[in-house]
Amino acid sequence: MATTPRLASLLLLLALCAAAAGALRLPPDASFPGAQAERLIRALNLLPGRPRRGLGAGAEDVAPGQLLERRVTLPGLPEGVGDLGHHAGYYRLPNTHDARMFYFFFESRGKKEDPVVIWLTGGPGCSSELAVFYENGPFTIANNMSLVWNKFGWDKISNIIFVDPATGTGFSYSSDDRDTRHDEAGVSNDLYDFLQVFFKKHPEFVKNDFFITGESYAGHYIPAFASRVHQGNKKNEGTHINLKGFAIGNGLTDPAIQYKAYTDYALDMNLIQKADYDRINKFIPPCEFAIKLCGTDGKASCMAAYMVCNSIFNSIMKLVGTKNYYDVRKECEGKLCYDFSNLEKFFGDKAVRQAIGVGDIEFVSCSTSVYQAMLTDWMRNLEVGIPALLEDGINVLIYAGEYDLICNWLGNSRWVHSMEWSGQKDFAKTAESSFLVDDAQAGVLKSHGALSFLKVHNAGHMVPMDQPKAALEMLRRFTQGKLKESVPEEEPATTFYAAI
């Protein structure tokens, strides 16, 4: 039987993998995505819940293509705070068998005219509620399960939506496995459909500036989602969404460039020695070859690329040991790098579940099933859609905490500089400037035209958690078109904020 060129390439790839694996003496589970998914999630103390089947008792149903939303005052808030303009709801996805997307919507503490911002947490398969309560939401959870106001919450300056975008993540669920998404096309179409219904529900916000934000695997979600919104606007498909820009924090966007940067970053940060660097770099050529086969198809070759290229990261982690790969300044305590267990406890409270309308639907912080379903999407290059957005004037901010290993600033900076667009040469020639917050350097900024890159000091993977004030200032200046300004205009005090 004749061998097709693609099959021959895959066979060659497997041979290269075997040779490189022998040279590296990798651990037995180094190339198996299931084992890695479980290890990554356990390291974050985010154990996946059981698969959800059907509508949970007490959860409100909603017709396909419709949105069911309620105003929310969460238990644990101080008494007498009044109506905060907080909402929670489900969107019943059309063109699915039984999928429902969960979201929070927090109106701005400032003005109704503030921009509408949507936040997407990555994973893939991790809930945006992690950001609500640990990063940039209105409040954090105290150990006694009370809620403490976050004075740097992004709702201070925006009307912000937090969505669990993939079925099986957070409180989003379906009774039918066929609703599981495997690529960005499915996720971005779901999000676009959600926005169409959301703005019909909230027409008072439809003319506001709109920005897409997120971190980690949202480096895949966001470019595809932004392109979907932009194309929908161009084709007059429905309600015009006033997309002005998007921001990706410590994202995975161009794997071919970012995986190659792992060893350089690890060596620069003294995580590995030069001999380790030379040895692990033997995996880079087969990784590059595998990604080339993958292209932008998201097929079986992309799974092979995932297995090959993650051997680079796994080999580094074998040497790094107990260090936190989301923040290399820190050690993981045992198997746990961060403890988000208060979130599980909070959502286990019956009063909380009744308040947000989820009934007994099980909350899943991070889902291994969603992670595995997206594996063929992992090594795809999502940078390819960004130049067209830049050319049409959509503002793009790529930011990265300097101490993150897994989606490090070096790899992000390299793909940003390598991106081909009309301003590429001028961007490369632009001098870096200090990003100042309270007259102190909070980061280093490079900006030209619609493109900006910000390296954030003293932060790891989750910049809004590590540097909340700098993150809020970043959002303020980005959404106001003043990112290059060192000192923002004084924010007028509001009676509302003073009251809380």
Curated annotation (Swiss-Prot):
Cysteines joined through disulfide linkages: 126-366, 294-309, 332-337
Active site (catalytic residues): 216, 404, 461
Propeptide section residues: 22-73, 485-500
Signal sequence coordinates: 1-21
Keyword Ribonucleoprotein tagged: no
Glycosylation, residue list: 144
Record-listed E.C. numbers: 3.4.16.5
PROSITE patterns: CARBOXYPEPT_SER_HIS, CARBOXYPEPT_SER_SER
Pfam families the record matches: Peptidase_S10
CC annotations in GO: vacuole
Inducing stimuli: By gibberellic acid (GA).
Molecular function as annotated in GO: serine-type carboxypeptidase activity
Keywords on record: Carboxypeptidase, Disulfide bond, Glycoprotein, Hydrolase, Protease, Signal, Zymogen
Binding site for substrate: 407
Subunit details: Monomer.
Family: Belongs to the peptidase S10 family.
Protein name in the entry: Serine carboxypeptidase 3
Organism whose genome encodes this protein: Triticum aestivum
